[in-house]
């Protein structure tokens, strides 16, 4: 059996590995679009730990397991305590014996890191206060499907507008790793910080990607993809709605004027859920340049590929495993034979 692989951050994967994962995801998507559901996860069980509520993440993981022949178990907030009454070590050890793979959407990034360290099965980060790596994969699938004619990924410019959320940082990680140009256009005090920049510097040195952090709206010009997220994600408890609006509105609202400034062929992306009338207008969200609902569908696309990628590698059999399997099958059939 091969050593297990976790998916905690894309920083642990090479560009080639991530592109292979996306290629696998899109191939499975094509199969399903044509009516064939490959049973690649037959008899596999996914344990889903949620410290935070979710729509797209939960539905995508449950649907992915079901479509590929497996099963998902939803462990809701309050049903399981990571490091509470039971230690993370004990929780991960037990779930490793009951499931084939785990996904955790956690409040603190260290919780999913500790879970992966203690588990003997693969662990996926479904989002933490540090990053959102499954969103990254869906975004990469979407950008590849909507590449401008004649351009490669490394020719493209991606601009994130607004607050430095986990999604903003995750988008910066995946785009710079692909050798793309990334821009964070946001107000001072709500931009990617020195820790983020240190990580991005390391990636760009190897990939040839580049990034800019600015509050100058001219940085939007020439964008191939314009991306935004909600304005209250990180500061909901600290800032009132009125304070948030004073900081972000109207300069950082993606509207038709901003899209025009980016360029005629620019596509609009949003991780959802969106607050229409705040970070995004109805006109752009529902307009011809919006690919945010394709992006939402590709959460499922990429999660199918990720589950197969991690489980197929981890569960790869050798001839001795097959011999043991046949022997166990014979013993069970003998036991069940009527006397």
From Swiss-Prot:
Record-listed putrescine binding positions: 270-273
Main location: cytoplasm
Site feature location: Important for structural integrity: 29, 145
Enzyme class at the top of the EC tree: transferase
GO MF term set: amino acid binding; ornithine carbamoyltransferase activity; putrescine carbamoyltransferase activity
Cellular component GO terms, alphabetical: cytoplasm
SUPFAM superfamilies registered for this protein in UniProt: Aspartate/ornithine carbamoyltransferase
Function: Catalyzes the phosphorolysis of N-carbamoylputrescine to form carbamoyl phosphate and putrescine. Is involved in the degradation pathway of the polyamine agmatine.
Subunit annotation: Homotrimer.
NCBIfam families to which the protein is assigned, alphabetical: orni_carb_tr, PRK00779.1, putr_carbamoyl
Family, per entry: Belongs to the aspartate/ornithine carbamoyltransferase superfamily. PTCase family.
Name this protein carries in UniProt: Putrescine carbamoyltransferase
Species for this entry: Streptococcus ratti
Species lineage: Bacteria, Bacillati, Bacillota, Bacilli, Lactobacillales
